[in-house]
């Protein structure tokens, strides 16, 4: 999982990427290709 300060560019890397808020943190998740996972902060 990558840790980035900005997730906007990571969201556009794959068409199945979704932005999710969990416990005040922002994550990018991808069910079909898990190597695109990322976390902000």
Curated annotation (Swiss-Prot):
Family statement: Belongs to the bacterial ribosomal protein bL36 family.
Domain of life: Bacteria
Any one of the GO BP annotations: translation
Listed PANTHER family: 50S RIBOSOMAL PROTEIN L36 2, LARGE RIBOSOMAL SUBUNIT PROTEIN BL36B
Name of protein: Large ribosomal subunit protein bL36
Keywords: Ribonucleoprotein, Ribosomal protein
Gene source species: Phenylobacterium zucineum (strain HLK1)
PROSITE patterns linked: RIBOSOMAL_L36 (PS00828)
GO molecular function, one term: structural constituent of ribosome
HAMAP family registered for this protein in UniProt: Ribosomal_bL36
An annotated GO cellular component: ribosome
């Amino acid at each position: 999982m990558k840790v980035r300060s900005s997730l906007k560019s990571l969201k556009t890397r794959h068409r199945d990427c979704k932005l999710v808020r969990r416990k005040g943190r922002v994550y990018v998740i991808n069910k079909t290709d898990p190597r695109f996972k990322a976390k902000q902060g």
